[in-house]
């Protein structure tokens, strides 16, 4: 179980390091091109969630994040100890949630910097990537878990 908390901690560390480097090296709203027309870093301060929804609702984000962290820890110890894939997806979600929570708590906004140039997509950060991949893996897990359960019931009814 400890390994999954270590994974979360590594994600938080990488997230906070990239945010620190962004703030120290890129002026607010300025862009540093990495791969022209593909990838750049743009320092952005987001007071909301994805696409800046719920902008300025910090108390709401504090409460939701604390609930999510509590639920993740609960499931990590109840379900995660029996399934590594499930625990890994939870560790990604936990790391991402804590990474953005730290920003909201101390800065009142989230530092975003990664910009994909070839599509119209919001600027994001390492915590956002971790959350997204964790949720995607969780959905895959839930789909296959339900499928397995369905197949077992189907075989059991014959």
Language-model-derived ranges and their functions:
Residues 1-158:
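Alpha-helical transmembrane bundles and membrane-interface segments of multipass inner-membrane proteins
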């Amino acid at each position: 179980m400890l390994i999954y908390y270590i994974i979360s901690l590594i994600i938080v560390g990488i997230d906070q390091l990239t945010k620190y480097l962004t703030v120290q090296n890129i002026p607010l709203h300025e862009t540093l091109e990495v791969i022209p027309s593909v990838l750049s870093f743009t320092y952005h301060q987001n007071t909301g969630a994805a696409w800046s929804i719920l902008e300025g609702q910090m108390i709401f984000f504090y409460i939701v994040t604390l609930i999510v962290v509590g639920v993740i820890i609960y499931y990590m110890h109840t379900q995660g100890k029996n399934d590594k894939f499930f625990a890994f997806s939870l560790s990604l979600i936990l790391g991402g949630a804590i990474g953005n929570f730290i920003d909201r708590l101390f800065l009142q906004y989230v530092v975003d910097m990664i910009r994909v140039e070839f599509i119209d997509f919001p600027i994001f950060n390492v915590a956002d990537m971790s959350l997204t991949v964790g949720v995607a893996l969780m959905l895959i897990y839930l789909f296959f878990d339900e499928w397995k359960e369905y197949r077992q019931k189907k075989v059991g009814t014959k």
